[in-house]
Amino acid sequence: MVELTITGDDDDILSMFFDEEFVPHAFVDILLSNALNEDQIQTQSVSSLLLTRLDFYTKNLTKELESTIWNLDKLSQTLPRTWASSRYHKEAEQNDSSLYSTESLKSSKLEYYLDTLASAVRALETGMHNVTEKLSDLDNENNRNTNVRQQLQSLMLIKERIEKVVYYLEQVRTVTNISTVRENNTTSTGTDLSITDFRTSLKALEDTIDESLSSAIDNEAKDETNKDLIGRIDSLSELKCLFKGLDKFFAEYSNFSESIKSKAQSYLSTKNIDDGMIS
């Protein structure tokens, strides 16, 4: 038998037969009409070559078709009993019930492969769902941590403000008790404070500050300052806002505040330092 190899020209010849507009009898008519004008021996040679090619292509196409049919038939065959049994038990365990009848033991290989692929896809979906849930839990935990941190910061701020309020109230109590301490040498027992007592307390405190400033001027060098005393005067000046709404007390404390700040500025003017230590 003559062996033939498929070349580019052979592909072109073969592709002609796959043309949707190909007309077999028209092809034969053209072939025979051309043969009438050629030598008979040459015509027989061409015909023999065409028949040989036809036989070759037919056998190859038949072989490929048989192989394809065999593969499809193989996929449609019933699974071996061990494969089918393991698949049945696995699916029964996953679904926690016997949802598959004995007919499932006769599944084909193709169905087995498709079911295996479907199981893998479901497992992937479950994994993605678990990952999504974990990410969501982490986000919620981060949000909770952020809220706790913000609450802690708020509580710290509240604590700081409360401590400042307590400090100012202690300062006010100290101021209002000065006159009582001077007269009775004891602290106030919480009795009502008159405007006269309040004025007396402020006057006594102002005299004490004035004496401290005078002593500092006499005993300090030009480049030294009593920062504790200046800080104390600044703190007492800040208490003025606490007396707003108490007209008589506010007026008395305003005069006191302006007086001690003026004395502090006079003290600082004797020093070789920059201005602005008193707010």
UniProtKB/Swiss-Prot annotation:
It is a peripheral membrane protein. It is found in: Golgi apparatus membrane. It comes from the Eukaryota. GO terms for biological process: cytoplasm to vacuole targeting by the Cvt pathway; intra-Golgi vesicle-mediated transport; retrograde transport, vesicle recycling within Golgi. GO terms for cellular component: cytosol; Golgi membrane; Golgi transport complex; mitochondrion. Keywords: Golgi apparatus, Membrane, Protein transport, Transport. Acts as a component of the peripheral membrane COG complex that is involved in intra-Golgi protein trafficking. COG is located at the cis-Golgi, and regulates tethering of retrograde intra-Golgi vesicles and possibly a number of other membrane trafficking events. Component of the conserved oligomeric Golgi (COG or Sec34/Sec35) complex which consists of eight different proteins COG1-COG8. Present with 1360 molecules/cell in log phase SD medium. This is Conserved oligomeric Golgi complex subunit 7. It comes from Saccharomyces cerevisiae (strain ATCC 204508 / S288c) (Baker's yeast). The lineage of its organism: Eukaryota, Fungi, Dikarya, Ascomycota, Saccharomycotina. The gene is COG7.
